[in-house]
């Protein structure tokens, strides 16, 4: 993916941050609201850029924000909320 949509990235970051705990891939997809092929593109992009970390919870793969992802959340999502007053992410 050459140019990701920053609003979609913000939805990923917001979903993982607001969850407060690691999430399964399916739950992330449902909360972000993308079809599977598009979700996979963004998911892989986020992982490749170090915004997520993978964990294990009772034998299931779960994902949460990495420290870099938390920083990106604070910068991008906060900027969107401040700039687009009241816009739902």
Regions found by a protein language model. Give the residues of each.
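Short alpha-helical segments that sit at the start of domains
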Residues: 1-13
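Short amphipathic alpha-helical interaction segments
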Residues: 2-3, 33-48
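Short, locally clustered residues in the helix-turn-helix/winged-helix DNA-binding domain
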Residues: 13-20, 77
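Short strand-connecting beta-turns/loops that link adjacent beta-strands
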Residues: 21, 57-59
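Short acidic, hydrophobic short linear motifs in intrinsically disordered regions
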Residues: 21-31
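A short, conserved structural fragment
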Residues: 47-57
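Basic, amphipathic "hinge/linker" alpha-helix immediately C-terminal to the N-terminal HTH DNA-binding motif
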Residues: 59-76
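Amphipathic alpha-helical dimerization/coiled-coil segments
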Residues: 74-89
